[in-house]
C-alpha cells in the first residue's frame, strides 16, 4: 500500500467510526473497508467478556451468522485467545502449517482456503486488552505480513478509541438520566 493509499485508508476508517454511534454498525463497516483495501478473505473483531472470561465474535466478514454465534474462545486458546491473553500481535504466513490454528468457525473448508495468511492484533484500552482484530488474506510470498500487522494495529487502536468514546457517551447519558430522576424526585417531594 502506497503512502497516499494508506492515508486514504485510515481517513476512510476514521470517517466511518466518527459517523456511527452504534458499535456493531461501525465495526461491520470497518471490516468492509479492510476487505476492499487489503484483499481480506475473512475478518473478525472479537471482544473479551470479562464477566464470563470468554471471547466472542462481535462482528465478522466472510463468516456465517450461525458460526459467529456458536464460536467462543477461552483466554489463551488458539491464536486469537493467545493474542488477547498476551497482548502481542501474531502473523501466520500459511494457516495450513500452523497447529495452533483452530478454525472454530469452520469457514475455511477447501484446500485452496488453506493457502491463507492470518494476521491477528490485540485491541487495547490503555494497557488492558479488550479484544482482537483478525484478518485472513490470500497467501503471497512477497507480501509483508509485518507491514499488514502495523496497519491493523493502527486500525485496532482506532477501534479501541471508538469503543472508549461510545462507553463514555453511554456513561454520561446514564449519569444524566440518574440526575434527572433525582431532580424529579426532589420536585415531587417539594410540591
Q: What does each of the following model-derived ranges do?
A:
Residues 65-66, 93-117:
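Signal-transducing coupling segments at domain and membrane junctions
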Residues 164-191:
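Flexible nucleotide-interacting loop at or near the entrance of a catalytic core
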Residues 66-90:
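Acidic/proline- and glycine-rich, intrinsically disordered low-complexity segments
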Residues 82-89, 126, 151-170:
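Signal-transmission/dimerization alpha-helices at domain junctions
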Residues 1-2, 136-153:
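Regulatory loop-to-helix N-cap segments in sensory/regulatory domains
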Residues 44-71, 97:
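GAF sensory/regulatory domain recognition
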Residues 116-124:
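A short, aliphatic-rich beta-strand micro-motif
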Residues 1-28, 36, 176-185:
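Signal-transmission linkers at sensory-effector interfaces
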